[in-house]
Amino acid sequence: MSDISCKKRDDYLEWPEYFMAVAFLSAQRSKDPSSQVGACIVNTENKIVGIGYNGMPNGCSDDLLPWRRTAENKLDTKYPYVCHAELNAIMNKNSADVKGCSMYVALFPCNECAKLIIQAGIKEVIFMSDKYHDSEETTAARLLFKLAGVTFRKFTPKYSKIVIDFDSINSRPSQKPQ
């Protein structure tokens, strides 16, 4: 038997990188021109039970609602209408409940999403960026998480990029031992 067939590869994605990558890939579905955020809910058996990204509510045309960040009238911005990735991941769950699960998310959740996360029974939030750390919304979210016993931590990736190469499936493995 050759060495190739006896040794697993070393550069595979470990679970945390995989789940955060799924959150980031999901974010690519967002039509928001300024913020693409994804979330991935995982149970204790490392099974994905929910995925979501930021977007307009089901049945509401994203061609008719505004995507701008600022306007004189708040109703002319995206903020009263858009559903955050965390909400969509919880609503899109493929399991009876998400109690005890972990959520991987690109951005630290706002206070409204923190309330949903707590009510859903999610026990851990792993986030990539906390760029709004000093905002009232994320300050309130951190307080809510602490009071409810939801742990949160910043994700430190092993790789700065994960490339999806659709052509790689067509290449043949090398027959030379390494």
From Swiss-Prot:
CDD domains cross-referenced by the UniProt entry: deoxycytidylate_deaminase (cd01286)
Highest taxon in the source lineage: Eukaryota
Record carries keyword Iron: no
Catalytic activity, EC: 3.5.4.12
InterPro entries: APOBEC/CMP_deaminase_Zn-bd, CMP_dCMP_dom, Cytidine_deaminase-like, dCMP_deaminase, dCMP_deaminase-rel, Deoxycytidylate_deaminase_dom
Keywords assigned by UniProt, alphabetized: Allosteric enzyme, Hydrolase, Metal-binding, Nucleotide biosynthesis, Phosphoprotein, Zinc
Catalytic activity: dCMP + H2O + H(+) = dUMP + NH4(+); 5-hydroxymethyl-dCMP + H2O + H(+) = 5-hydroxymethyl-dUMP + NH4(+)
A matching Pfam family: dCMP_cyt_deam_1
Residues binding Zn(2+), per UniProt: 84, 110, 113
A GO molecular-function annotation: zinc ion binding
GO CC annotation, single: cytoplasm
Modification sites for Phosphoserine: 174
GO biological process, one term: dUMP biosynthetic process
Regulation of activity: Allosteric enzyme whose activity is greatly influenced by the end products of its metabolic pathway, dCTP and dTTP.
Cofactor: Zn(2+)
Catalytic residues in the record: 86 (proton donor)
Limits of the CMP/dCMP-type deaminase domain: 14-145
Subunit-level organization: Homohexamer.
Task of the protein: Catalyzes the deamination of dCMP to dUMP, providing the nucleoside monophosphate substrate for the thymidylate synthase/TYMS. Also, part of a nucleotide salvage pathway that eliminates epigenetically modified 5-hydroxymethyl-dCMP (hmdCMP) in a two-step process entailing deamination to cytotoxic 5-hydroxymethyl-dUMP (hmdUMP), followed by its hydrolysis into 5-hydroxymethyluracil (hmU) and 2-deoxy-D-ribose 5-phosphate (deoxyribosephosphate). Catalyzes the first step in that pathway, the deamination of 5-hydroxymethyl-dCMP (hmdCMP).
Protein name per Swiss-Prot or TrEMBL: Deoxycytidylate deaminase
